[in-house]
């Protein structure tokens, strides 16, 4: 049996929402900290951060931890922000895209 991607465990469409939400949350926090992409990447590349912020790439846990540290927060705080955003997006009365 092949390796399963964690995003394959999500309902159809939610993997894109998770990538997009995580990228948006990271970008929001980076801008709030008044950091450029170059200042926020640590050992990562600016191209990688751009891909993550645009929702095209799901960061690994290690990359998420590095980015969180660069932003002066923790990975769980970032994920909490994404969870809140996703829950409000999928809540009754909110029109899903």
What spans do the regions from the language model cover?
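DNA major-groove recognition helix of helix-turn-helix/homeodomain DNA-binding modules
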Residues: 2, 60-78
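A short, Lys/Arg-rich alpha-helix, primarily the initiator
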Residues: 2-32
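Short, charged recognition helix plus adjacent turn
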Residues: 2-8, 16, 79-97
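Helix-turn-helix DNA-binding elements, focusing on the entry/boundary residues of the two helices
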Residues: 26, 37, 46, 61-64
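Short alpha-helical DNA-recognition segment
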Residues: 31-51
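Localized chelating/binding microdomains
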Residues: 38, 67, 97
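Short, conserved catalytic or interaction motifs in soluble domains
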Residues: 54
């Amino acid at each position: 049996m092949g390796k399963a991607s964690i995003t394959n465990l999500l309902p159809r469409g939610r993997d894109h929402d998770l990538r997009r939400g995580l990228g948006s949350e990271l970008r929001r926090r980076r801008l709030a900290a008044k950091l450029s992409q170059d200042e926020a990447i640590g050992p990562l590349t600016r191209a990688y951060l751009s891909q993550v912020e645009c929702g095209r790439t799901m960061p690994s846990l290690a990359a998420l931890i590095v980015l969180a540290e660069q932003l002066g927060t923790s990975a769980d705080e970032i994920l909490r922000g994404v969870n809140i955003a996703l829950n409000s997006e999928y809540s009754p009365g909110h029109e899903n895209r």
